[in-house]
Amino acid sequence: MKHLSSLVVLLLVGGVWSAGADPKGDRKLVAKGSKVYAKNCVQCHGPGGDGKGFESMLQKLGARDFTQGVFKYRSTPPGELPTDEDLYRTIMEGVPRTPMPHHALLKKKEGRAVAQYVKTFFPAWKAEGEAQPVPLVPRPKNAGTPASLERGREVYRFLQCASCHGGTGRGDGPRAATLPPDTLGNAQYPTDLTLEKFKSGPEVEDLYRALMTGLDGTSMSAYGQIFTPPGDTGLQERDIWNLIFHVLRLKREGGFSAASP
């Protein structure tokens, strides 16, 4: 097994030199990342980064195919590649309620190295460069107040969030059973907003990012333009925070006392 692991590392590193697909020219960092990848990632994502590792074949939820250049968890606009920091955050923190574990035992340099190596699987990364994150609208002082929560409930209803997530946020809306597979071919299930952990991350800023940029490759749309004036929806920038705190109330109260018909 040790010899097999060493062979995988050699193949991966060799692939970097032959392909010449180092987005930043830091071959030492990419080479280091390839070793981290071979030890921690290849089992699911595969030697070629296509999500066809042997463990992925045994899982209900397929691993991310890096060769497609489609990433759910980003701070960048829809359709754009994630930033280095986005990749690093996902690698280190993992994705709750999925087979993607956290890698808290990795050193920071190892996490950043494997993030650079992941980028070599999608050549367009070198040409397109790094997109700019969507600006974070400051949280209003009244966010989470009774008036804010009521407004958030109205926004939830206006945007028809209940069609997928359900009025109580339990992921049982009328469209839930009819969503098509995502771009990886995985079945889609709307997030149960009452569960303890969101896949996008534990902070309110993570929820903000998911709502504003969407989850590429899935039916979860981006709402950034809707909340960005000028527009004719009647929504304002601060309404994204009203919606977020309504979602957090659904989570906190299990959806029962904050139903959004």
Residues of each region from the PLM?
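Solvent-exposed, polar/charged alpha-helical surfaces in well-ordered, non-transmembrane soluble domains
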Residues: 31-35, 39-42, 64, 85, ...
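Sec-dependent signal peptide recognition
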Residues: 2-9
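Electrostatic cytochrome c docking/interface patches
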Residues: 18-36, 125-157, 197, 235, ...
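Periplasmic/extracellular electron-transfer cofactor-ligation site
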Residues: 28, 34-61, 97, 124-128, ...
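Contiguous, function-dense segments enriched for cysteine-driven chemistry
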Residues: 74, 108-117, 121, 141-153, ...
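Hydrophobic h-region of N-terminal signal peptides that target proteins for export
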Residues: 10-19
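Axial heme c-ligation environment in periplasmic c-type cytochrome domains
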Residues: 57, 73-82, 86-115, 191-192, ...
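Primarily the internal scaffold of c-type cytochrome electron-transfer domains
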Residues: 58-64, 68-70, 113, 133, ...
